[in-house]
């Protein structure tokens, strides 16, 4: 060690910057301030380091032995003996020269650049910054042997910390194909980068201005012009068009809708200003509404994977809140200096808070400037699964839907709608308290809402029919069958034997008549109401259950468990906002469908009176808690009731057999009395049919069993039934596509029938015949015309309607006058 020190001193005495007149060897500090800095060599630098070490050691170095440590002593052999604990080496960590290859210049540049970025990030994280003089210049390494070629993009500082987006053009945008390669952790982060955002805006603007239909007409150019003509603020964009023209944008829209919609809305406003330069004076924003999203979910299909994605759901509106102002762009006023701060965009998930005034540098307090703050319309509705889509035995699911801007008040309770929106999560403290661990509530932020017709199709121009061309041809071919009426009647509840009159009434109710609106002022309903009254065990409830499964939209209720507000509508106080909200009942939820009420006679008189308006005017008027409104209840009502005492007494009139008032009875188009009479022949056939049904319904059923050959399978109606799936499609097609008109109607025959029925009703003391029954005859005629998909009501359809009305009227009479009435009305049945 001492020899090493001496060698270091000797080297230091011969440094090149020593002057000839120096005594002990001058250091650089002894040079004049104006002298140029001397050149340092590696040996000189090493010598200076050794001198510094010597000075720091001080007296500790003098303690060492002058001879140094003897490495060749007597214990030298022990150092080279085997030691199992220490002689263990990890092969992977050994620096083996054989496994290394010399890097080329490009690889060395990449390694150096990576190390340099690491140093910059570590310095930035530790708060250390280098002076500008020590920053490496971009030309330093070009002259060196390594030639790293490190280039700084001073005009784009964020590139050091953002993903490598690729090659940019002169305008800072990317080719459309390059943005498909997502170079970020998520699509939401990728589309927020400036180059990607500008590229998306450019491509969507080209889509709006250049997309044409098969005739070469600009689709969205015409829609933008129409938007300006009606002063609207929503631009409808078909998702199929976007997927066909710009599939990358459609993919980004489905998976990151929130940032994409902000880009689309800004581009839509720019495209609108091309046609209407001053349109911002009318609307400051244009909202892009996405229609025809290909996949439609039910509310129970939504999962965690759908969060923050664009979804499409359908359901029935059960509740709607009032209209609230929502902060959109907020401005604050500093109370100390009076400066106005903002505007700040108010997101729906994060509250805007400021803590510093740029004018007076104070930390508040700040108040909201209400005059210059921009608000947005806000409303919440509750969407519930449609009654026909809920699995049996399950409760219907519901979700809160947020309506913003011009979407408010587009749907009322009871209407079936199709919602396209963003499926979001929302913090709810009550759920955390209830479950004991963090749980988020989920909402749907609506982007587009369209009304659904009875068949589940939207009412906009972009809806697609559920029926294929082959199915429509099959339906029209079925309508040409000569016995189509009998086949439809035989297909009604095939598991129930007989009861042709009830099946005819139910078939007519499912097809319905044609609603009319006289000069837009007076509406005449087209739905047919049916009342089934009879003895226990006559399959009344089974008929209702069959209709519930067959009808496209059906709501089942019982008279004992249904109150007035449960059938019509109720007003409920929201526990959060303390606001009175409106909730629709069974009749409102069954709008454009069928409402089935079992045990109709068990209802209270007050509850039964509440449905008077719904049965005739097909609307429900509400005047409660300051809410005065009208809800739609355009539905068919099929009710079942038991007579007084349990069994129907044929010796007394109809109105004495049931506890129903005349206003209710007159609103039913068809009154069907079902009596359990003793008939040995019919009873034997019924018993055989029931046994056959049980045998065929067994899981181990064998169609080749000999016992079945002796058992009849007919339902008591001589016609071939239609498969149930085809029958449902047939009914939906007839209700939505066929609207028969009255032509060549025998007005004299109808008037004479009405006159005779009123006279006999007064004489027999039965239920009264009113003008409503005359309208019932017309509705039944239209229903039979719909069964044939006929465009006009023919005389044969009127004859069938008259037969149903006469049978309903005669069967409701006393036994003593039934035969005479049958002979009186026989002339109308020829």
UniProtKB/Swiss-Prot annotation:
Cell location: Nucleus
Domain MCM: 484-691
InterPro entries in the record: MCM, MCM2, MCM_CS, MCM_dom, MCM_lid, MCM_N, MCM_OB, NA-bd_OB-fold
Keyword Oxidoreductase: no
GO terms of molecular function: ATP binding; ATP hydrolysis activity; DNA replication origin binding; H3-H4 histone complex chaperone activity; helicase activity; nucleosome binding; single-stranded DNA binding; zinc ion binding
Main location: nucleus
Protein known as: DNA replication licensing factor mcm2
Name of the gene encoding the protein in the UniProt record: mcm2
